[in-house]
Amino acid sequence: MKTDIEIAQAAEIQPITKIAEKIGLSFDDIELYGKYKAKIPLEVLEKFDEQTDGKLVLVTSINPTPAGEGKSTVTVGLADAFARQDKNVMVALREPSLGPVMGIKGGAAGGGFAQVLPMEDINLHFTGDIHAITTANNAISAFLDNSLHQGNPLNIDPRRIIWKRVLDLNDRALRHVTIGLGGPLNGVPREDGFDITVASEIMAVLCLATSISDLKERLARIVIAQNYDRKPVSVGDLGVQGAIAMLLKDALKPNLVQTIEGTPALIHGGPFANIAHGCNSVLATKTALKLADIVITEAGFGADLGGEKFLDIKTRQLGKQPDAVVVVATLRALKMHGGVDKKELTSENVEAVKKGFANLERHIKNMQSYGLPVIVAINQFASDTESEISTLKELTEALGVSVSLTQVFAKGGEGGLDLAEKLSAMLQAKPDFRYLYELNQPLSVKLDKVVTEIYGGSKVNLSPKAKRQMREIEENGWNNLPVCMAKTQYSFSDQANLLAAPEGFEVTVRELIPKIGAGFIVALLGDVMTMPGLPKNPAALKMDVTDDGKISGLF
């Protein structure tokens, strides 16, 4: 079979103006970025404001293997399947970060015959949104350090600056740096560090903002440091929220592209789900809900991370809950959770599937606990055997849950027709949605609910630093914000090697970081990194471009 990029390059891509017409947008309703990409201005959303929202389908997954389980692929293929059934459908996805693209994953725009196009553009610089976020983030750093240099009128304690610079690459050497060296003309020396851009609070702010004015208000609230009296210092205190919003005004507009089969797709925003909230932008999802009858969207990593955050964080800003949830499962991931070594995952092992099913079962029950109907999509791989597939189907159906074997990677929309048909029936009912916690509950209760009710743990321990931070959060009146757990994606726990569905474990919160602009409190668990490193053999080693500009090796 051809590689993803070979399939994408051989596909017949339509002018973006034709894709816009499918969802009722005229030439004047879009801003072209070349022939195959466009942005949708915010006024267009206002134009369709009275339109009834379409149905919303959330695609999530079990705890993944390092290679991922194909959530984006299933999301795209499912949208194409609905389109084949003459449904007015759109897909809403996150945009990829260059760090993982050049590092371990390669491209991140779906796979096989279920991809979004133009694949190379989306995976590289796209419309420049992530670069704008990088610039906006680092501009705040520059203004902060300038304030220190110019007499420190805000009385900022350089030892208590929490705002870091960012870069959209994996670069471990930048995690801890010293800046301001070289004498008085070069600023105030202090310790600093870099995060990957998609971990920046600016990314989360962009993805949760609903307008330019909301964006400005959120930017102003971002806490960047403490002063010598241990009081918070914000971007608003620097007085640069207007300038930063100016840098982001175009990045705030959703990006319109298409799938291989010509289904309209909005790709906008890309926060990681293990260190941020892991969902595409509220504006993109809102826009899709106004323009389509069915919207398929995804949330990063497993249902314990992106899924939980979509439901407890994003939906509160979106004003709309999913009408159904698709949990993507693969036999290779179930076998990994069943104790099989990663090198043996392509070999048949029915007993490991049975043992690893505990992971899928917990994810199903977690999503059902929100009052949502759930269907399992088995993302089929060539190594899957009939006995493994039938075992997984039987185990899932024994829970009273629908299951569908999807082959969208190999067959595109055709491979998702059964899933689309079963979902159509599920979408007729209105779910009785309920949140995991209420915003007015104490932060300690919210943490406890996520750990005990979603993860299956028994207790939350706070480090001395986290205890102090919790007191400061309460003193500053930030207790009514949702929690955003930052942890490993491979396990329900904070330990990557604790697979399947562990119980009775304790988790330790290392730090509680207030992201007041985004509107949540990040709880750092385990050793999760906000600036990844490159592997020994980065994916970039296989990438190249010919003399005539044709890209190869991008997954």
Curated annotation (Swiss-Prot):
Q: Which Pfam families match?
A: FTHFS (PF01268)
* Record keywords, A-Z: ATP-binding, Ligase, Nucleotide-binding, One-carbon metabolism
Record-listed ATP binding positions: T65, P66, A67, G68, E69, G70, K71, S72
Q: Which InterPro entries match?
A: Formate_THF_ligase (IPR000559), Formate_THF_ligase_CS (IPR020628), P-loop_NTPase (IPR027417)
Q: What is its EC number?
A: 6.3.4.3
Its UniProt pathway annotation is: One-carbon metabolism; tetrahydrofolate interconversion
Q: Name one GO molecular function term.
A: ATP binding
Question: Which reactions fall under this protein's catalytic activity?
Answer: (6S)-5,6,7,8-tetrahydrofolate + formate + ATP = (6R)-10-formyltetrahydrofolate + ADP + phosphate
Q: Name one GO biological process term.
A: tetrahydrofolate interconversion
**What's the family?**
Belongs to the formate--tetrahydrofolate ligase family.
Any idea what this protein is called?
Answer: Formate--tetrahydrofolate ligase
Species of origin: Lactococcus lactis subsp. cremoris (strain SK11)
